[in-house]
Amino acid sequence: MISSSHFAIFCIILVSLFALQQYEIGNMEENLNASKIVVYLSPCVRKRCSFSLFKNCHCCRGKYHFCSKNIKVCEKECLRLNPPRPLP
């Protein structure tokens, strides 16, 4: 048979393990949310211009093509021509 002091120690350990497990679950959720990395993928790629031998144009990746020497202009037009799909 278990003595009362052994039973008390067992109960303290059991309660401590439950509290530790609850803490780890909360900590794990925080770490999961903090580890979500957002990667920006430009809608434009560098390509060779039709009028040049160098890769100095930026063209849309999507269905509708547009090329520009300026990356900002390309991104703006590509997002207008090929809007990103909504996330599920």
UniProtKB/Swiss-Prot annotation:
Write down the superkingdom of origin.
Answer: Eukaryota
**Signal sequence span per UniProt?**
1-23
User: Which tissues carry this protein?
Assistant: Expressed in stems.
**Keyword tRNA processing appears in the UniProt entry:** no
Q: Which controlled-vocabulary keywords does the entry list?
A: Disulfide bond, Signal
Q: Which family is this protein grouped under?
A: Belongs to the MEG family.
Question: What protein does this entry describe?
Answer: EMBRYO SURROUNDING FACTOR 1-like protein 11
Q: Which organism is it from?
A: Arabidopsis thaliana
Kindly list the organism's lineage.
Eukaryota, Viridiplantae, Streptophyta, Embryophyta, Tracheophyta
